[in-house]
Amino acid sequence: MKHTTLIAVSVAALALAGCKKEAPAGDAMATSAATDSTIPGVTPAAEVQRSPSQVFADTAAASDAFEIATSQLAADKASSAKVKTFAQQMIKAHTESSKKLESAAASATPKIVPDAAMTAQQQQVLSDLQGKSGAEFDKAYAAAQVNAHQSTLNALKAYATGGDVAGLKSFATEMIPAVTAHFNMAKGL
């Protein structure tokens, strides 16, 4: 068994080594650029640090995107009228919240642009919800809403007390009562 594994690893290593594309000998610039991973003045994207305010704005934007996407799904898949009504309220509230966030973030210097890309966890929950319907969907949607609103509430409270951009602090403070109400409504679904 060990012999077979060793052979398989060796074959894979040789195959990868054979895939290496060499730059033409006369193309010293291409060779230099391909091997020089530290170009002065350029920070690789993976190493760029986001400010705490950018992280907060991205978290809030992703939360809004998640709430809207899952609530749009509820319009089709939910069986309970109460869940459907709640979902419509969430679409409206989080669309408005997104606009307020963008306005607050634009007041920052330098300007902050919220990234509404959902986290892997949010995408997974959305994917899981897409596979459910009826009462099963209602139960999973309600649980997702409780968890999402609790996380958002925690982020808002933390930024409201410790944030460093006045516009975003005001946004966080303003949103706490609404998100608290949504959290309590979600617990009642």
Predicted regions and their residues:
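His/Met- and acidic-residue-enriched segments that coordinate or traffic transition-metal cofactors
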Residues: K2-V9, A13-L189
